[in-house]
Amino acid sequence: MPTINQLIRKGREPKERKSKSPALMGNPQKRGVCIRVTTMTPKKPNSALRKVARVRLTNGIEVWAYIPGIGHNLQEHSVVLVRGGRVKDLPGVRYHIIRGALDAAGVEGRRQGRSKYGAKRPKEGGKK
């Protein structure tokens, strides 16, 4: 434990916070190009085929990004917008692709939580 004099001389040094999404380099989103679009299996006890893409960002860093929602139109060379946010049961996936931006189309037929999936407002009198 330091003395008062030592604290006056040197002071406390704040701990540096480690970023949870370092590839974005402090930006809210980054653009990237899909290198590979594939599926991954989650950790135990979950079971599924989660849709993911290997994306090369504009700063040259390659990351795995999750493709949210049901169905997608992404393929190799698609240009996408990537945000931070990990997928808990997919190790190594620390980013999400933003639906409805650039080449990633919004989710078709989505009625609730539409803004998160880039879905337009459905026409009135459509099917229930």
Swiss-Prot record:
Question: Does Transferase show up as a keyword for this record?
Answer: no
The molecule here is called Small ribosomal subunit protein uS12
**Per the similarity annotation, which family is this?**
Belongs to the universal ribosomal protein uS12 family.
Instruction: Cite the residue spans of the region called Disordered.
Output: 1-29, 106-128
Entry-linked InterPro entries: NA-bd_OB-fold, Ribosomal_uS12, Ribosomal_uS12_bac
Q: What does this protein do?
A: With S4 and S5 plays an important role in translational accuracy.
Q: Which residues form the signal peptide?
A: none
User: Could you tell me which NCBIfam families the record lists for this protein?
Assistant: rpsL_bact
UniProt modified residues of type 3-methylthioaspartic acid: D89
- The yes or no answer to whether the keyword Transmembrane is present is no
Q: Which Pfam families does the record associate with it?
A: Ribosom_S12_S23
Q: What quaternary arrangement does the UniProt entry report? A: Part of the 30S ribosomal subunit. Contacts proteins S8 and S17. May interact with IF1 in the 30S initiation complex.
